[in-house]
């Protein structure tokens, strides 16, 4: 959520930033109008409360002097009713303002390129060279079924479209990837490992920005009023919700693996085959809590942490800056990492790393103190995929496939695969 002071002090800046996302800047005028009404109500209410205190003194004086106090008692009752009415009006305006503010996205960093869609994202780095095959490469969805690594048909029977059973060495590869990623982030990148709740309440979803605007993208357990998480970013970031982080704790770096659940509303017809766009998938997440002056360097470091996984696995990728029309709701700046997939003859997103600045912290009330005597300040929060496991799985299978139908295991994964160096079709 944005600071109301930005609307008061820099309305034109806020309007231009909102317009860059393709949203209606008139919302700024709505907020300012409500804010003015609110301030007038507060002044009127304070004046009434001051008068009520004065009347209370007059009543006491009249009682001491045994004078008739009917008139001041009547005024006291009227003031009480009027104050109650003003408080009700103030509460209504507060709710209206919050309802509007919570749907306004974060302000975009000045260095984010302008554009309308992912076609306008800007490449800033490329690593590795896509492999030139001496045979016709297969798509990962064909390879995994031939090698008995996955079963999409039975998953559809059990759960519907966009689900998968990972079987045999497919399940082993998924588990190996998660273990490898978590191990690298904790032992080399300085993150603390967390196992997170995968059902969370509405306040938690609100804190990271999924609610109220994106409820259609979520799965909800109606009876309990809980939501399945779309990413471990949600419970990891909310770890410090409604807390003041004590001096010396920041920077705080968490990583965790979880299943992620997404309805994929609006993605009908896109990536309908394979592991690229499922309703349930595994992902290793990185979340950081930083002091404001450190968050931009932290974004670069976090993105490098994700890139290190791809480089050690030998997977060609590129880094792009998301443009103003493609960046997420809570982010001020986002880098996407896109891995090369031969079946698409293109790069596909495998990680998003974002600096949300104080946007999520204001919603979730996450503050920190620089020292014991300091006033609490809003922390900056960052999140990044490190990586999407299913997409990494698909990239390995496609980029490391062999003409005889086998798949070579990247060297970095061999210890996590029990020493296995190749995946072949099971004998039985």
Curated annotation (Swiss-Prot):
L-serine binds at residues 231-233, 285, 385. Pathway: Aminoacyl-tRNA biosynthesis; selenocysteinyl-tRNA(Sec) biosynthesis; L-seryl-tRNA(Sec) from L-serine and tRNA(Sec): step 1/1. Its main location: cytoplasm. The keyword Phosphoprotein does not apply. Its EC number is 6.1.1.11. It is found in: Cytoplasm. Keywords: Aminoacyl-tRNA synthetase, ATP-binding, Cytoplasm, Ligase, Nucleotide-binding, Protein biosynthesis. It is an enzyme of class 6 (ligase). It comes from the Bacteria. GO terms for biological process: selenocysteine biosynthetic process; seryl-tRNA aminoacylation. Transmembrane segments: none annotated. ATP binds at residues 262-264, 349-352. One of its GO terms (molecular function) is ATP binding. InterPro entries: aa-tRNA-synt_IIb, aa-tRNA-synth_II, aa-tRNA-synth_II/BPL/LPL, Ser-tRNA-ligase_type_1, Ser-tRNA-synth_1_N, SerRS_1_N_sf, SerRS_core, tRNA-bd_arm. Catalyzes the attachment of serine to tRNA(Ser). Is also able to aminoacylate tRNA(Sec) with serine, to form the misacylated tRNA L-seryl-tRNA(Sec), which will be further converted into selenocysteinyl-tRNA(Sec). Belongs to the class-II aminoacyl-tRNA synthetase family. Type-1 seryl-tRNA synthetase subfamily. Consists of two distinct domains, a catalytic core and a N-terminal extension that is involved in tRNA binding. Homodimer. The tRNA molecule binds across the dimer. This is Serine--tRNA ligase. It comes from Staphylococcus aureus (strain bovine RF122 / ET3-1). The gene is serS.
